[in-house]
Amino acid sequence: MPLQHFINQEKSGGIVLGISIVIALVLANSPWSDSYFHFFEHKLGFVFNGDNYLYYSLHHWINDGLMSMFFFVVGLELKREFIGGELADVRNTILPIGAAVFGMIVPALIYFSLNAGGDTASGWGIPMATDIAFSLAILYVLGSRVPLSIKVFLTTLAIVDDLGAVLVIALFYTSEISFASIAVGVVFLLAMFIANKLGVKNVIFYGVLGIGGVWIAFLMSGIHATIAAVLAAFMIPADARISEPVYLARASKLINQFREAKPNDVSTLEHEQVEIIDRMMSDSRDAIPPLQRLEHSMHPLVSFVIMPIFALANAGISFEGISFDAVMANNVALGVMLGLLIGKPVGIVLSTVLLTRLKIAKASDSMTMRRLVGVGFLASIGFTMSMFISTLAFVDETFLIQAKLGIFAASILGGVLGYILLRLSLIHISAPTR
């Protein structure tokens, strides 16, 4: 099923992402640490008539460029889920949506209560995020004994969490806005929307408008370019060039023609058969909506290339000269750690109990309290999105390092605690629960 395929891809990506984080930490604390940090500060851009355009550091290009592809896939997933997935029927998703919302609010409140009024207050958005790749990777390690309802709950929660993180970035981590550039970006978005309504299915067309128009305009506007990627993703057509009944009729006809075109038993195909296969391949491609075609083709790139590169560029922390007193000089690390490790589980558990007690939503029979708390701890793994938001929240390198330390501590502890609780709760289950 689509959800199971999504989970399988995410858990594999989580493993690769974990390896990349370890490599980044090793490099940052090795004899090559200076080379490691300086490498990502190299400037890249375009020069025209002696002037530099889009001239940013490699680190900036990774966070605003490559990560836009990650957010584009997030946008595709969100649109698919709203149309026909876990978020299509709100009645079936009240529980994980409520858990996601409370799981974002409580961590933010915990952080803000410890950092209100100071220079570090802007980091309140850091502990709000869940890393879907890592959380699902741990569910994968637990094996097939994990009830599907728990996988659906955590996946839906993480999807809503992603949407919340995107909104937080757009509304609270954007400054120095150029409304002229935004207007240009909106014009290109409108062009993509109109093309969608007119039935244009060519993904190259949308790619040119999305990158050459929307993304560059938003990059120059002051709004984080990753938001442009999400908006552009929502403009991608979700209906196929040919409908399912038409595809089935054509495929059946072509299969019959294929059978009739071979007069003997030789291993090679007749020329007519090759042409029939070409037509079937073309029809099969046209039967897949552009949205799903892009999502399917980009997922491996994002999971196994873009996310590991992001981790290599952002996860490296040098522990040289870092003391406990220095880390605790302010409440950044503590706020992030407590927000993720305490706020996430508390928000998720309290909202679930509240919604079920009020009979607003119904929890699955397989969702025991121990498993719910375990899922809450898995949701406290914030690696990717939390690190990304931390780079937007803090310019001061000291605050940034402290935030990353809090993220690492909470994510590791949350992952271990979540694994142990779920493992103990599943100890008597020997076969998959569907």
Model regions: which residues?
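Transmembrane helical segments that form the transport core of multi-pass membrane transport proteins
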Residues: 250, 262-358
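Entry/N-cap segments of selected transmembrane alpha helices
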Residues: 81-108, 178-187, 321-343, 407-411
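Transmembrane alpha-helix boundary signature
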Residues: 27-39, 53-56, 73-88, 107-125
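Functional cores that coordinate and move charged inorganic groups
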Residues: 139-246, 252
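Conserved small/polar residues in nucleotide/adenosyl-binding loops
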Residues: 427-434
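C-terminal ends of transmembrane helices
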Residues: 2-4, 75-88, 136-147, 190-201, ...
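Hydrophobic core segments of alpha-helical transmembrane domains in multi-pass membrane transport
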Residues: 17-28, 72-76, 106-108, 188-193, ...
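Hydrophobic transmembrane alpha-helices of secondary-active transporters
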Residues: 50-51, 55, 60-84, 303-322, ...
